Amino acid sequence: MSVQSHPPVVCLLGPTASGKTAAALELAARTPVEIISLDSALVYREMDIGTAKPTHEELASVPHHLIDIIDPLESYSAAQFMTDAERLIGEIRARGRTPLIVGGTMLYYKALTQGLNDLPQADATVRAELDALAAERGWPALHAMLAEVDPITAARLAPNDAQRIQRALEIHRLSGQPMSALLARQADARTFTGAADARYRVIALEPSDRAVLHARIADRYDAMLKGGLIEEVERLRARGDLHLGLPSIRCVGYRQVWEYLDGDCDFATMRERGIAATRQLCKRQLTWLRSTPERIGIDCLAPDYVARVADAAGW
């Protein structure tokens, strides 16, 4: 069978706490699928509670991919996801099964469907220099530095968004040009012709009432805290080789608990920060989803939302 004759790959996207995992598992009961995780936090081993990782029973009920694949000391890029996902789609189809992509890391989705921008590769020396500078001056100071050389990028980043500030400054140091200018130039030159529309069917879980989703987020974070999130972070800290500069420890929820264990805040403040950070993540995910014209929107609060997803998927 040629690539063109395959049905589109269904991508079930949505913000945190929108019911993606539950919907995916119900869909798996209807169709012989294998799930490809589109989640930058689920790739890490030893990080189960704060990532809302599917349970062992759920993982055993249907094949899952790109979960528990790296150590928290390591990093996993959008480029790696793109390569892995494309390979997995082919392998799953070769087994006579249906790939189902599920998650909320929109950068991964963009990489898979539109390709990656040709930006300079990460440079360990430059990153170490920026980390040292941040340790001395703080990330808001580096954000101010970024504003001087790339005001467009700086304007869309929070002063404490360490990972993105570091990447933008790294690109400027390596290329001598603002990241925003490089991205704009590459967008103008891109020959991508909209293959995402043909190869992927995007189903987006979007709440009709954001307040309900916000309440879910608070309840879920409380459940994580009661379920052992603090103890999970304590085990990560006990390793001795992890720190707040790593993408794994900067994951929403983990960072706030880590800072709490550092003595930076009390329990109530940590809880508030964790919920607020999760809601901010949700807001960014929804903004990105709603800027995706090819999506099929489904109200994740509707009682029959799983049936609607199945209909949209053609299953």
UniProtKB/Swiss-Prot annotation:
Primary enzyme class: transferase
Gene Ontology molecular function terms on file: ATP binding; tRNA dimethylallyltransferase activity
Positions of region (Interaction with substrate tRNA): 39-42, 163-167, 250-255
SUPFAM superfamilies in UniProt: P-loop containing nucleoside triphosphate hydrolases
Gene3D superfamilies noted in UniProt: 1.10.20.140, P-loop containing nucleotide triphosphate hydrolases
Known cofactor(s): Mg(2+)
Catalytic activity: adenosine(37) in tRNA + dimethylallyl diphosphate = N(6)-dimethylallyladenosine(37) in tRNA + diphosphate
Subunit structure and binding partners: Monomer.
Family: Belongs to the IPP transferase family.
Name of the protein described by the UniProt record: tRNA dimethylallyltransferase
UniProt organism field: Cupriavidus metallidurans (strain ATCC 43123 / DSM 2839 / NBRC 102507 / CH34)
Lineage: Bacteria, Pseudomonadati, Pseudomonadota, Betaproteobacteria, Burkholderiales
Gene that specifies this protein: miaA
